[in-house]
């Protein structure tokens, strides 16, 4: 037994060492944790991210402006850290906010323009990441572009984007009054029972100072201001065409107020960017950072006035010309001293006093930034934008957008830089005229563009759509023929031509073009193939060919299961047979499919309403006609059906209202002619003649006016 004593002694010694090391480790960890927590505690108070639309940094006193009308922002800046060189990744509202709220560049999140793009549901937003850490999340936004359909509402438990509907002949609002947005944000703050919340507010530059002042006051009222982290940032610089990538467009204010004004009065001179916001805010609350973020946390420079950031070139892009008419996209990389810009030409812009050539100079910087941009773009792909919904066309036109040529986009022109800039401006002006319902003037503006630059297939396509709207069908067919000549590989051109031929009653030729579109669409997006088969099904219905209509309807559904063309076609066939109950059942099924997938289909609610009307279910029929007009505000037949329903129900005041709505929504020769014809049918010949007189004055010289008047008297 004595021989075991040394072993027991050794084991006791080892155990003592292990226990001692354990306590040393625990104590060390506690000490490190205490030191780290003391030096850099997690922000426990509320977080406010206030985005200001179109406010250049140079207009604020904290950025050197001598005269300002932003006292609240100026006061906040004195309690904050100011970033002197903060940059956006896009001179456009939606792409810049997508980067701001995801920490991803436009090529990564996929939102490349303001029209036809939305943030994918698979993308994780800052709101989602904070909500998973126990934050209550809310948002109030002013811009139409940031409504929930943009995808930016992901992760927000509360997202207020309600824009009041226009009244009478008013144009639809592109944003709501800033006071309404601030009201919504204040109400949300008042309802919070704790301080761990994240609030995002987007406001136009005109309302920015009021927003900062009122929200700061609301936090103070609830004793949350001192502990709050407030980030004020611009979405982009000066508003314009979305083309410029210079400092006036890309440089934005960035002001960060930390709890208890930590670091107040300091300035950070290193270049920073929108995609730094997500990792910074996550770091401030000690939340884990997800993989795939290209930005970096700015906490080091927030905590330490001596800290500096390593240079990291900042990416920006503009696809304004590319998506609007096939022009050349623009890209930029901003470094410490230079910005490299690539568009029609390439340019190196000095941002600071030039570097001595012995230290590298312009040629070295240009080569470095050019190579870095090449690497970034090498793996970047660009999807074509989705079509603008009919209900949104007027708003987007007022923002300078017409429906994009729905084809895999490619640069279609060799315009030089001056010509491209002038074309962007001319195209934007044409779109705004159309948004103002000055259709004839808008058509003339588009015609001037294609006279100057004939190869622009996208503009011919947009011109054809506007001519068709005005009832100038033969001219529309010519425009779409030109699209087919310029882009014979594009299914969209054949589809548009088929539609115009249908309007002209030339169904045989329409069927031929629909078949061409189907053949071309086999090599494109499945949505295009579905649209081609849907067009073929509609042509077959007009030709009373139920077999072909059914076959194409099934093919459309195979290409896109969210498109209930089979139910629509079955409903149409049953309706034509007078089986209104069965037809209504098919239309109801189609309606449910669209509701599930969030789509729309022209004439679905119209025929659903017609079926219900013939079953004497007038209130339900009225609701369907209104649904049609909500999705397709210029559907003349829906106005006609609604007016006749009101007449049958002895609702004469409603008849007058709906005919006034018709003329307001479709101020075209067709709209006036249909309204005049309906007044004639209703025995109001004087009112009909008054409308015709107004039309002659408004559309004097319009080629379609005489034909419309002749049709209206039949």
Task: Give the location of each predicted region.
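TPR/TPR-like alpha-solenoid helical repeat scaffolds
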Residues: 527-535, 600-607, 611, 643-648, ...
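Start-of-helix register in tetratricopeptide repeats
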Residues: 424, 458, 492, 527, ...
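Catalytic domains that recognize anionic headgroups
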Residues: 2-499, 503-508, 512, 523, ...
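Canonical positions in the second alpha-helix
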Residues: 448-449, 482-483, 516-517, 555-556, ...
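Terminal, low-structured helical/coil segments at or just beyond the last alpha-helical repeat
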Residues: 657, 669, 674-714
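Structural marker of alpha-solenoid helical repeat scaffolds
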Residues: 452, 486, 520-524, 559, ...
């Amino acid at each position: 037994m004595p021989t075991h004593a040394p072993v027991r002694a050794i084991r006791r010694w080892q155990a003592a060492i292990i226990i001692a090391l354990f306590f040393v480790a625990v104590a060390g960890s506690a000490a490190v944790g205490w030191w780290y927590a003391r030096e850099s505690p997690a922000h426990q108070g509320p977080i406010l991210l206030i985005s200001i639309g179109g406010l250049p940094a140079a207009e604020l006193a904290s950025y050197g402006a001598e005269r300002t009308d932003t006292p609240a922002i100026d006061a906040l800046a004195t309690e904050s850290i100011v970033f002197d060189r903060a940059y956006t990744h896009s001179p456009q509202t939606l792409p810049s906010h997508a980067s701001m709220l995801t920490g991803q560049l436009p090529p990564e999140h996929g939102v490349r323009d303001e029209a036809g793009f939305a943030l994918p549901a698979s993308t994780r937003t800052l709101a989602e990441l904070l909500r998973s850490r126990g934050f209550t999340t809310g948002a109030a936004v002013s811009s139409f572009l940031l409504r929930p359909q943009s995808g930016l509402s992901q992760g927000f438990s509360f997202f207020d984007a309600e824009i009041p509907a226009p009244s009478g002949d008013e144009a639809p609002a592109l944003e709501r009054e800033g006071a309404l947005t601030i009201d919504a944000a204040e109400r949300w703050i008042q309802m919070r029972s704790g301080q761990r919340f994240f609030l995002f507010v987007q406001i136009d530059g005109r309302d920015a100072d009021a927003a900062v002042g009122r929200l700061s006051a609301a936090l103070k009222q609830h004793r949350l201001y001192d502990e709050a982290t407030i980030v004020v940032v611009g979405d982009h610089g000066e508003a314009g065409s979305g083309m410029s990538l210079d400092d006036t467009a890309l440089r934005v204010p960035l002001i960060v107020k930390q709890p208890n004004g930590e670091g107040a009065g300091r300035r950070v001179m290193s270049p920073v960017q929108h995609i730094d916001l997500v990792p910074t805010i996550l770091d401030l609350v000690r939340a884990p950072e997800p993989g795939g973020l290209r930005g970096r946390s700015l906490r080091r420079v927030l905590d330490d006035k001596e800290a500096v950031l390593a240079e990291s070139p900042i990416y920006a892009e503009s696809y304004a010309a590319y998506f609007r008419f096939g022009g050349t996209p623009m890209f930029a990389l901003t470094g410490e001293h230079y910005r490299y810009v690539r568009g029609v030409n390439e340019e190196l812009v000095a941002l600071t006093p030039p570097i001595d050539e012995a230290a590298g100079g312009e040629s070295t910087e240009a080569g470095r930034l050019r190579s870095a941009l090449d690497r970034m773009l090498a793996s970047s792909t660009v999807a074509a934008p989705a079509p603008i919904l009919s209900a949104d066309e007027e708003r987007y036109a007022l923002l300078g957008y017409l429906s994009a040529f729905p084809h895999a986009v490619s640069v279609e022109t060799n315009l030089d830089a001056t010509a491209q800039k002038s074309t962007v401006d001319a195209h934007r002006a044409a779109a705004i005229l159309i948004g103002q319902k000055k259709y004839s003037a808008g058509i003339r503006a588009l015609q001037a563009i294609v006279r100057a630059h004939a190869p622009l297939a996208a503009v011919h396509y947009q011109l054809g759509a506007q001519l068709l709207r005005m009832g100038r069908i033969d001219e529309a067919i010519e425009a779409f023929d030109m699209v087919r000549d310029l882009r014979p590989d594009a299914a969209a051109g054949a589809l548009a031509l088929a539609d115009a031929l249908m309007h002209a009653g030339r169904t045989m030729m329409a069927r031929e073009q629909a078949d061409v579109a189907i053949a071309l669409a086999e090599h494109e997006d499945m949505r295009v193939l579905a649209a081609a088969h849907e067009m073929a099904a509609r042509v077959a219905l007009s030709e009373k060919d139920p077999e072909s209509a059914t076959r194409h309807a099934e093919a459309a559904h195979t290409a896109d299961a969210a498109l209930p063309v089979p139910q629509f076609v079955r409903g149409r066939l049953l309706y034509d047979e007078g089986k209104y109950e069965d037809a209504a059942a098919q239309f109801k099924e189609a309606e449910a499919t669209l509701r599930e997938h969030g789509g729309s289909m022209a004439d679905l609610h119209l025929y659903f309403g017609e079926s219900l009307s013939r079953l004497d279910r007038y209130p339900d029929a009225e609701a369907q006609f209104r649904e049609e007009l909500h999705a397709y505000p210029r559907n003349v037949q829906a106005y006609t059906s609604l007016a006749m329903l009101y007449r049958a129900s002895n609702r004469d005041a409603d008849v007058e209202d709906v005919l006034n709505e018709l003329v307001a929504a479709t101020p075209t020769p067709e709209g006036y002619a249909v309204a005049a014809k309906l007044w004639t049918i209703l025995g109001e010949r004087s009112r009909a003649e008054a409308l015709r007189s107004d039309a002659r004055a408004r559309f004097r010289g319009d080629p379609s006016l005489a034909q419309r008047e002749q049709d209206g008297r039949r």
